[in-house]
Every structure is written in structure tokens, then in C-alpha cells.
Amino acid sequence: QWGEVWVVAGDARQRRRQIQVVMNAIRAGTRFEFCYSESSTMPTTLTEPHHLPTHPLEDFAFLTRLRRHGIPVGLFYRDVYWKFPLYGEGVPKAKQLVAQAMYRYDLLAYRQCLDVLFLPSLRMGEWVDVGDRVKKVALPPGHDIDETPTATPPSPLSMFYVGGLGSLYDLRAFCEAVASVPEASLTICTRPKEWEQARKDYEPLMGNNIKVVHANGKKELEPYFAAANVAVLAMAPHEYRDFAAPLKLFEYIGNGKPIIATEGTFVGDVVTRDELGWTVQASVNEFAALLEQLTQHPERVDEACDRVMAARDQHTWAARVEELVTALAAVDQR
């Protein structure tokens, strides 16, 4: 339904060949509606297998040439993790400085070669300086869950969290609150390595109503989603969380689960704005009070679930494509 898509991908040599094919087609009269690109998690110049900047201009020059032919160019900029002290953890200082310099080079290049910079949230735009000409547009993640989720009874309160447990994923206050409400239960799904690193901090806070499991991929996660009636993104606030748009938020929505979130985070703002669950302060007392309410009033879980189900289609990947098409059409001056 999106028409014909031409792909420029692969290593530098493969991209060079594909770029030539595209430019020849443009000269022959082919009309391209727009160009959409996505940044790597690495700096663009370091994405070759050897991680050396052997082709520092090629990709940016291609995007600039497309703009000169009047083709709107948009790029999704994935993350600014590199601007935070946490980026340096486990990375040799020299490599860290080189990578950060190359990330800054990317931002300078975007000033010349883009019309639209797509970001997971507009708040992230405060950390990304690409000049005034380039338009910043929010394009959060989506979900690809086509099947209608099976309804889960609202009682007993059964919660599910899937994700990391590192410094950006601090769930300790929430775990302590869950342990104080025996009528509720929480299942944490995380990687074995992350659990081994975190268990000394978490186990003293956990009661018998919290269990840790390890599953990977949609199929393995299905039974845990099916058993839960509420999903959890109740991490302690962090400057990075102010704008971070985790994929898990939209995976939870796709699975039809209302969400417990924390104030002072992007997730909390979305949950509050769209009435997709509950947003509270990140404290043991606040979490415990909410859990007591939900165990005593399961109808509130049912009502929140209905609202999430009503919003599911607004947060699919297909809906995101419609959004980016609209944004790029708006800057087309042909």
C-alpha cells in the first residue's frame, strides 16, 4: 500500500552502487516522493565492520543531492545516550571521545542534508542541535501485534515488567512496594546476565509475590503477557527518562495492558495524556497506595484496559508510517 520502495542499505560499497542506481533513475525522470533514513546506534562514519571513518561524506552527500532534486529528506535519530555520563561505562576513554566527536559530526551534517529530523519524542530535540531550518517531528516507536490480545481477569492484580535492570531501569522502589502488598504479584523478565548483576540489590527487597524469569522474543513472552493484567514501567526518574521513548511502552499497548508509570518521565506523560494507566511519584509509599487501590477496585483495571484497547491502533508501526509520510509531504516544495 506504500507503493514502490527503493532501498539503499548494506556496507559502504553496496550503498555506493545503490546510490548510483537511484541517481541514474532520478536523471531518467523517476519521481521519488521522499527519502526516509534511520541513524545507526553508532556514528554514521563508524558503521563499517572495521569501525574506521573511511567514507565520512558519502551518505550525507547522497542525501544532500536528493534535496537538491527537490526530494524531501527525513531521518530518524534514534538516541542521544552518548551525551550522558552513562555512555562512558565500560568504554575506553579514547574510544569514547572519538565516538562522541563523530556523533557531533553527524549532527553538523544533518544541518545540510535533512528537511525533517524525526525523534522518539520532541523533548529529545532539546539535546539535538541541527539548526533552525531542519524541522523536528516526534515519531515514537510502535507495535506490530496484529492479533487481538486475550482479555485477562482484573483480579488478582498480576503485573509484568520486561526489560533491563541497570542504572537507567531502577525498579527497586516498585519492588519494595509490591512486597508490601501480598494480594498483588509481579513477574520481572530480564536477561540472565542483568539479573546476576542486579540480584544483590533487588533480592533483599523482594517478597514471595515477585518472581524473575528469562524469556526472549514474542513467542516466549506470550504466556507472561497473557497472565498479566497490568504492565510496569515504574522506573525512578532520570534526566534521560525525561525524553526516552522505550519500545516496551508500545509493546505493552499492543498487548492491551494498562501501564503503571512514574511522574517526571516521558512514559508517565504519555500514560497520563492518553489515559493508558496510572502515573504516580516514584516512591515506595505512592506505589504501595496505588497497588492497594487496584487490588481493592479491580474494575479500575478493567476500565484502563478498555482505554488501552481503544488506543492500540493509534500506536502501530503502520500508523507511524502514515505520520512520517504526512510530515515529509508537508515540506515538499515541488
Regions found by a protein language model. Give the residues of each.
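N-terminal subdomain of nucleotide-sugar transferases
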Residues: 1-13, 18-20, 24, 30, ...
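A charged, aromatic-enriched C-terminal amphipathic alpha-helix characteristic of glycosyltransferases
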Residues: 150, 282-284, 296-329
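Conserved donor-binding/catalytic core segment of Leloir-type glycosyltransferases
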Residues: 149-169, 175-179, 186-190
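Nucleotide-sugar-dependent
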Residues: 169, 219-224, 229-251, 261-269
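Nucleotide-activated donor-binding/catalytic signature segment of Leloir-type glycosyltransferases, i.e.
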Residues: 190, 197-227
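Membrane-proximal helix-turn-helix segments that form the acceptor-binding/catalytic region
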Residues: 57-68, 83, 96-116
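Donor nucleotide-sugar binding/catalytic pocket of nucleotide-sugar-dependent glycosyltransferases
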Residues: 99-100, 106-150
